[in-house]
């Protein structure tokens, strides 16, 4: 349910270029009218706040200082539970084609692990990646490419 709220918000406000300065109370009321549960709405809004905080933190500079570009990401057991082999392979693919950097990959993994959901699949990961790339300045080209990957697949054109 939390993933549904995030996708709804992303498509309604961010992707559609709608007015972004919406009061939290108004937003909560709209989400309640759309049929979402209060506890899920709260969790989704906290998740978005944490995404915004990641962008403003020194995490990315600390990550890039510690990781060589040729290093391989070793996933924890908990991360491997959430991110199956297909998801991890997709993250690696996006790094190899320069859609994700080391920093944005770590932000994506952080936000994936921040989700409170028992089910998580590749399509969910693609949406999380899109949200992270949209939120981090300087990633416009990567965002556009990821958006094409997501929407082309949804329309059934990608072979």
From Swiss-Prot:
InterPro entries: Smg. It comes from the Bacteria. Belongs to the Smg family. NCBIfam families: PRK03430.1 (NF002897). HAMAP family: Smg. This is Protein Smg homolog.
């Amino acid at each position: 349910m939390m993933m549904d709220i995030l996708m709804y918000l992303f498509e309604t406000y961010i992707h559609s270029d709608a007015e972004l300065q919406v009061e939290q109370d108004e937003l909560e009321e709209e989400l309640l009218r759309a049929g979402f549960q209060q506890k899920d709405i709260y969790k989704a809004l906290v998740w978005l706040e944490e995404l915004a905080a990641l962008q403003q933190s020194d995490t990315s500079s600390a990550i890039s200082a510690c990781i060589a570009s040729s290093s391989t990401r070793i996933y924890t057991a908990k991360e491997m539970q959430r991110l199956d082999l297909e998801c991890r392979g997709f993250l690696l693919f996006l790094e190899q084609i320069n859609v994700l950097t080391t920093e944005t990959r770590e932000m994506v993994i952080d936000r994936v692990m921040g989700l409170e959901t028992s089910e998580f699949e590749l399509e969910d990961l693609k949406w999380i990646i899109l949200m992270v790339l949209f939120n981090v300045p300087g990633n416009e080209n990567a965002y556009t490419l990821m958006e094409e990957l997501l929407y082309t697949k949804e329309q059934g054109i990608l072979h």
